[in-house]
């Protein structure tokens, strides 16, 4: 769903844990901002996965600004459904591989030399631009890491969700142990941890 915001009124409003309305504003300084909630969700997933900040270099564009920068006439940026992003310290190829994993059958993913374009269109589009935009079949390669229960316990310990990993690694958990662990994980997530 695309929502309309005012930079002056809503600029500092958080649309997700790590993104505010202002970050989606047109680079021409206009007040009106269109933002698709699915785009915000996608960007937050990317942010959570890499654990690195994301700079949105271009999101919503007014028609006048889009024409000024020679943007595509039917650009998803005009609809508030697209963002050009830089994930700090992560190569564009790694970002597009993860985006392909998240959106294998829909959405737009464009790989450029120093940024990535993502959009939440219902159809599927993939391209690269190294001087001239060209369509590609996709960006396969990302595989979700499968963790063992021991890996999961180590991760929870390293993130300071639990403080006695050996107790959890023993393998026989009571219902109360599981309930306590779920409460700890829920508290961690609700406090912004990922």
Please report, for each region that a protein language model flagged, where it lies by residue.
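Solvent-exposed, polar/charged alpha-helical surfaces in well-ordered, non-transmembrane soluble domains
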Residues: 41-44, 48, 93, 97, ...
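Extracytoplasmic cell-surface/polysaccharide-interacting catalytic and binding patches
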Residues: 1-47, 113, 122
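Sec-exported extracytoplasmic/periplasmic mature domains
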Residues: 48-51, 90, 100, 104, ...
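Catalytic cores and adjacent binding grooves of peptidoglycan-active enzymes
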Residues: 74-83, 87-144
């Amino acid at each position: 769903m695309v929502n309309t915001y005012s930079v002056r009124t809503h600029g500092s409003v958080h649309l997700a844990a790590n993104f505010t309305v202002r970050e989606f504003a047109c680079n021409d300084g206009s007040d009106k901002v269109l933002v698709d909630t699915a785009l915000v969700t996608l960007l937050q997933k990317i942010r959570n996965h890499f654990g690195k900040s994301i700079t949105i270099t271009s999101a919503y564009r007014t028609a006048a600004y889009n024409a000024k920068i020679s943007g595509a006439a039917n650009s998803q940026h005009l609809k508030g459904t697209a963002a050009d992003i830089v994930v700090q310290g992560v190569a564009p190829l790694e970002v597009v591989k993860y985006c392909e994993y998240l959106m294998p059958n829909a959405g737009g993913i464009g790989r450029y030399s120093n940024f990535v374009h993502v959009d939440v269109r219902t159809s599927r589009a993939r391209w690269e631009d190294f001087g001239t935009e060209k369509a590609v079949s996709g960006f396969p390669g990302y595989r979700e890491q499968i963790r063992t229960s021991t890996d999961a316990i180590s991760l929870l310990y390293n993130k300071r969700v639990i403080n006695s990993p050996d107790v959890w690694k023993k393998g026989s958990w009571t219902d109360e142990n599981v309930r306590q662990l779920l409460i700890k994980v829920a508290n961690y997530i609700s406090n912004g941890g990922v």
